[in-house]
C-alpha cells in the first residue's frame, strides 16, 4: 500500500514538472533566470516576489499582465544584484562635519521646492515674487542648517545663490524671535549685521534684502564706505532690523554711538575668504570682541555666525577655525571646480603674435552677437593698454580698477549693465573678480592669473544661476605650465584649490630632477656594460694552450679572466687603458646628459583653441 502511494505521488510530481517545463516553449518570454536569494534581504517589490506559480499560470492568457510580471521580476533581480555589492568603506578621517554635509547633499536630491525646507508663508511669498521655485544645492544645504541656529561656513561657487541661502532663514528666525521672545525693532539696535568686503557687494546684498523685505516684513539699511555719513546716521536713528555694510564704516558708526551691539543675534561675513585675504582680519576681530564678551554672560543667548565663501584655501580655513571655534563647514560638490555651464578655451601664444591683435580677434565675434564681455588684466598698466587699444579700434569700453574712484566705478557698472547702452566691454583687474552680480556672456583673460583661485573667481562672473557662458584665456609662454595644469584638472573634474604658478613650477622641477636621476642611472649602467665588453678579448683570439700534453679545452666566456691570461699581460699596462676608456666615456655621457637636459622642456602640451577655428601658430606663419 505504501509503495503504491509513493508511485502515484511520483507520477503526479513528474507530470506537474513536465507541464511547467513546456510553458517556456509555448511562451518564450516567460523564460526567467533562476532567482538568487541572500540572507537578510527584503524584496523591493514584495507583491512580485510572493506571487505563486498558479497565479502566473492562470494569467498566462493576459499578455499585459505577463509583461508587467516580467518587469517586476527584472527589477527584483536588479535589486538583488545591487544588494549583493559590498558597501564602499569610507576613510576613517572623513567623519563629523563631512558626514553631516554628505547627509545634507543626499537630502538635497529629495527637495524640489522651498516648502520642503520648512520656510514660512511670508518667505515663500517673497520667493514667488522673485519667480524662484527650485532651490540650488547650497540653498538645500544651508537653509536647514541656519534655521537650526548653527554657526556654519557655506562654501559654493560664485553665482550659486548663497545670498538667499542665509537671508531667507535669518529673516524667518527674526520673525520667530518676535513671536517667542517678544523682540521688537528698535532704533540703532539691529538684530542682524552683514559684513561685506566691498561697497559693490554691500549694495548687491542690500538689493536682495530689499526685494524680500516687503513680504517678510523687516527693515534693512545700507552702511558702506564711499558715501556720506550723515544720511546713514539718520537711517540708523530709525527702527531697523538688519544692517548691511563694510567693516570700516560700521565700526565708525559704533565708535560715534550711532549703533550699538546690544541686540545683535545674527552675524554674516559674506565673501569671508576675500576679507581675510585682503587684510580685514583686525577689523573683524575688533567687531567680534564685544560680541564675544557679551556671550560670556550667563543671561545672554549669544549670537549665530554665518560665513559665506566661494573659495576656501587651507590657510583661510585654518584662520577661520581659530577665530570661530566649533564652526561647521558645509560645502557643495562644485566648490573649487569648474563651472559646468561655461566653456573654457585656452589660446596658446608662442610669442611671435601680437597679443592685443589676438584679443581683438577674440572679441569681435562676441561683440557682433551683442554679448557682454569682461576683459581681465593683472596690472593697471596692462588695463590701460587694453583700454587704449580697444578705443582706437572703435570698441566702447568702461574701466574698473583701483585707480578709478568709487563713485565712478558705480557709474561704469551702470553703463555696462545697461542693455541699451553702448558699452558692452568692461576692462578690469581682479577687483571686479569677486562679489559682483553681473550678466556676462563672455570672460576674456588678457593676462592669465597667477593662481587657480583667481581663475575661479574670474570665471564666476559668467554662467551664473544656471546660465551659459564662455571663458577664453590668452596664454603666454610663461603661463603655459599653470594653464596646462588647470586645463588637466578641469578635464578630470578635479579640485583647483592649491594650484599656483610656484607650486606647478616646483612640481615640474621635481619631476624633471627625478627623470634626470633615472636617465643618469641608465647611462651609468650602459657605460659599465661598454667597459666590460671592451675588457673581454675578441672571439678571433687563439684559445689557451694546455700544458703537459693534455687535451685542449674550448674556452668559455669566463676563461678570459683565468690566471694564465692575467699572467701573460702586465697589470700596469692593462689598468691604464681602462682608466682612459672610463674617463672618455664618462665625459661623453656627461656632455650628452647636459645637452639633453637643456633641450628638454618640462610641462604638458596645451590643446590649442585657435582664432576662428585655426591655431595661433598657423596664423602666425
From Swiss-Prot:
Q: Which residues form the signal peptide?
A: none
Q: Has UniProt tagged this entry with the keyword RNA-binding?
A: yes
| Broad enzyme group | hydrolase
Q: Which UniProt keywords apply?
A: ATP-binding, Helicase, Hydrolase, Nucleotide-binding, RNA-binding
Which SMART domains did the record assign? Answer: DEXDc, HELICc
Chain positions recorded as ATP binding sites = 156-163
Q: Which domain of life is it from?
A: Eukaryota
**Pfam families in the cross-refs:** DEAD, Helicase_C
Its recorded reaction(s) are: ATP + H2O = ADP + phosphate + H(+)
Gene Ontology molecular function terms on file: ATP binding; ATP hydrolysis activity; large ribosomal subunit rRNA binding; mRNA binding; RNA helicase activity
Q: Name one GO biological process term.
A: ribulose bisphosphate carboxylase complex assembly
For this protein, the record's PROSITE patterns field holds: HELICASE_ATP_BIND_1 (PS51192), HELICASE_CTER (PS51194), Q_MOTIF (PS51195)
Enzyme nomenclature, EC number = 3.6.4.13
Short motif Q motif, span: 112-140
Domain named Helicase C-terminal is located at: 355-505
Ranges in a coiled coil: none
Compositional bias annotation for Basic and acidic residues: 503-537
Q: Where is this region: Disordered?
A: 497-621
**Domain annotation Helicase ATP-binding: ranges:** 143-330
> Which segments show compositional bias classed as Low complexity?
555-572
Matches recorded under InterPro entries: DEAD/DEAH_box_helicase_dom, Helicase_ATP-bd, Helicase_C-like, P-loop_NTPase, RNA_helicase_DEAD_Q_motif
Q: Sorted alphabetically, which PANTHER family does this protein's record hold? A: DEAD-BOX ATP-DEPENDENT RNA HELICASE 50
Q: Which family does it belong to?
A: Belongs to the DEAD box helicase family.
Domains: entry comment: The Q motif is unique to and characteristic of the DEAD box family of RNA helicases and controls ATP binding and hydrolysis.
Protein name (database record) = DEAD-box ATP-dependent RNA helicase 39
Amino acid at each position: 500500500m505504501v509503495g503504491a502511494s509513493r508511485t502515484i505521488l511520483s507520477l503526479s510530481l513528474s507530470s506537474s514538472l513536465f507541464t511547467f517545463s513546456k510553458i517556456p516553449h509555448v511562451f518564450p518570454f516567460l523564460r526567467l533566470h533562476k532567482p538568487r536569494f541572500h540572507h537578510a534581504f527584503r524584496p523591493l517589490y514584495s507583491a512580485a516576489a510572493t506571487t505563486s506559480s498558479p497565479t502566473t499560470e492562470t494569467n498566462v492568457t493576459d499578455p499585459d499582465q505577463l509583461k508587467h510580471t516580467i518587469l517586476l521580476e527584472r527589477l527584483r533581480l536588479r535589486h538583488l544584484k545591487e544588494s549583493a555589492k559590498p558597501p564602499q568603506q569610507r576613510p576613517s578621517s572623513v567623519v563629523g562635519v563631512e558626514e553631516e554635509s554628505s547627509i545634507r547633499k543626499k537630502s538635497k536630491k529629495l527637495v524640489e521646492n522651498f516648502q520642503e525646507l520648512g520656510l514660512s508663508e511670508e518667505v515663500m511669498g517673497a520667493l514667488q515674487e522673485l519667480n524662484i521655485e527650485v532651490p540650488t544645492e547650497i540653498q538645500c544645504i544651508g537653509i536647514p542648517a541656519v534655521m537650526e541656529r548653527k554657526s556654519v561656513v557655506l562654501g559654493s561657487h560664485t553665482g550659486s545663490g548663497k545670498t538667499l541661502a542665509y537671508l531667507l532663514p535669518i529673516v524667518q528666525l527674526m520673525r520667530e524671535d518676535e513671536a517667542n521672545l517678544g523682540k521688537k525693532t528698535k532704533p540703532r539696535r539691529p538684530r542682524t549685521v552683514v559684513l561685506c568686503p566691498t561697497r559693490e557687494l554691500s549694495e548687491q546684498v542690500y538689493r536682495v534684502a530689499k526685494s524680500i523685505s516687503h513680504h517678510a516684513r523687516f527693515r534693512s539699511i545700507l552702511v558702506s564706505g564711499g558715501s556720506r555719513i550723515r544720511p546713514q546716521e539718520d537711517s540708523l536713528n530709525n527702527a531697523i532690523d538688519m544692517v548691511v555694510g563694510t567693516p570700516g564704516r560700521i565700526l565708525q558708526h559704533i565708535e560715534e554711538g550711532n549703533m550699538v551691539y546690544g541686540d545683535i543675534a545674527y552675524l554674516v561675513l559674506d565673501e569671508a575668504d576675500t576679507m581675510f585675504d585682503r587684510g580685514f582680519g583686525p577689523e573683524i576681530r575688533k567687531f567680534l570682541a564685544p560680541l564675544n564678551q557679551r556671550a560670556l554672560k550667563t543671561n545672554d543667548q549669544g549670537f549665530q555666525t554665518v560665513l559665506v565663501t566661494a573659495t576656501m584655501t587651507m590657510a583661510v580655513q585654518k584662520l577661520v577655525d581659530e577665530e570661530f571655534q566649533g564652526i561647521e563647514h558645509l560645502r557643495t560638490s562644485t566648490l573649487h571646480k569648474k563651472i559646468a555651464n561655461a566653456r573654457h578655451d585656452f589660446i596658446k601664444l608662442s610669442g611671435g603674435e601680437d597679443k592685443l591683435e589676438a584679443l581683438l580677434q577674440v572679441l569681435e565675434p562676441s561683440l557682433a552677437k551683442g554679448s557682454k564681455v569682461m576683459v581681465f588684466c593683472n596690472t593697471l598698466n596692462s588695463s590701460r593698454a587694453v583700454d587704449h587699444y580697444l578705443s582706437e579700434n572703435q570698441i566702447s569700453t568702461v574701466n574698473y580698477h583701483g585707480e578709478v574712484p568709487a563713485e565712478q566705478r558705480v557709474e561704469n557698472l551702470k553703463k555696462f549693465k545697461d542693455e541699451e547702452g553702448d558699452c558692452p566691454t568692461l576692462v578690469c583687474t581682479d577687483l571686479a573678480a569677486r562679489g559682483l552680480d553681473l550678466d556676462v556672456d563672455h570672460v576674456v583673460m588678457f593676462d592669465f592669473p597667477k593662481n587657480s583661485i583667481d581663475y575661479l573667481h574670474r570665471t564666476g562672473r559668467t554662467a551664473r544661476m544656471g546660465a551659459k557662458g564662455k571663458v577664453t584665456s590668452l596664454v603666454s609662454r610663461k603661463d603655459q605650465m599653470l594653464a596646462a595644469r588647470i586645463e588637466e584638472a578641469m578635464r578630470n573634474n578635479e579640485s583647483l584649490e592649491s594650484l599656483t604658478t610656484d607650486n606647478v613650477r616646483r612640481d615640474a622641477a621635481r619631476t624633471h630632477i627625478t627623470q634626470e636621476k633615472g636617465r643618469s642611472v641608465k647611462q651609468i649602467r650602459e657605460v659599465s656594460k661598454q667597459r666590460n665588453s671592451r675588457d673581454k678579448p675578441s672571439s678571433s683570439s687563439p684559445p689557451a694552450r694546455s700544458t703537459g700534453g693534455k687535451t685542449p679545452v674550448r674556452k668559455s666566456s669566463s676563461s678570459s679572466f683565468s690566471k694564465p691570461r692575467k699572467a701573460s699581460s702586465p697589470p700596469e699596462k692593462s689598468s691604464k687603458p681602462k682608466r682612459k676608456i672610463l674617463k672618455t666615456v664618462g665625459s661623453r655621457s656627461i656632455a650628452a646628459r647636459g645637452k639633453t637636459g637643456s633641450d628638454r622642456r618640462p610641462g604638458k602640451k596645451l590643446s590649442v583653441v585657435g582664432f576662428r577655428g585655426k591655431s595661433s601658430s598657423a596664423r602666425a606663419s
